[in-house]
Amino acid sequence: MKRTYQPHNRKRRNKHGFRSRMATKNGRKVLSARRAKGRHRLTVSSETSNKK
């Protein structure tokens, strides 16, 4: 039986990346909540950037 989680980095970036979060109002709400909480990584796309 094929399992539900079939990871692909491109799909991950496109769905949960910074640009897709900024594209919607609720996505921006997510980012601001994560900033307020003091998260080290805001999105999955910030994991491999130079900003670490």
Swiss-Prot record:
Signal peptide: none annotated. Residues 1-19, 26-42 have a biased composition (Basic residues). Residues 43-52 have a biased composition (Polar residues). GO terms for molecular function: structural constituent of ribosome. Keywords: Ribonucleoprotein, Ribosomal protein. GO terms for cellular component: ribonucleoprotein complex; ribosome. InterPro entries: Ribosomal_bL34, Ribosomal_bL34_CS. GO terms for biological process: translation. Residues 1-52 are annotated as: Disordered. Belongs to the bacterial ribosomal protein bL34 family. This is Large ribosomal subunit protein bL34. The lineage of its organism: Bacteria, Pseudomonadati, Chlorobiota, Chlorobiia, Chlorobiales.
